[in-house]
Amino acid sequence: MILLARHGETDDNRPPLRVQGSRDTPLNETGRLQAAELAERVRRENLGELYSSPLSRARATAEVVGAAVGLEPLLDARLVEADRGEWEGRLFADLEREEPAGWAAWQRAGESFRFPGGESLREQMDRVMAALDDVRRASPPALVVCHGGSIRAALCHADSRGLDAFHTWEVPNVALVRL
């Protein structure tokens, strides 16, 4: 059994929303409180291992959980959020207004979508699934703390619609998904 958890809140997750991607943004105060709440939620899960994206927002969330359950987070760079290239750090509203064709393509997502100057959703899904396959072989039950896009990519892998389903799921901060 693998549990996926999204990191706690960062300032980029609060209005006005910004594209985070692979930028290393820290948890804010709400995010630190959410991490403690997540730790309480998973305390009963009898976890054998704890994995995390190395980005500080995921790592800090995993460290709070790890302290509560007695596990040290194992970092895996394949779990990071998509490299969103030229869009990273930009406001969603600005992208929608200034790059309407690109924004519309992102809202459709799918196999062919690539962030300008960044990674494709297929590349993200392939690396996330490689990491999760290694976790599954090595150490279930495990908690994997990562990112909304990484969790969506894993859900797309399990869905017959593939990456066309990317925007089907809402993955709020500290969401917990059982694979």
Per-range role (PLM):
Residues 52-53, 126, 145-146:
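Short beta-strand scaffold positions
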Residues 43-46, 135-140:
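Glycine-rich phosphate-binding loop signature in dinucleotide/nucleotide-binding domains
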Residues 25, 69-127:
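Phosphate-handling substructures
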Residues 5-72:
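Active-site-proximal alpha-helix that buttresses catalytic centers in soluble enzyme cores
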Residues 2, 138-146:
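Generic beta-sheet signal
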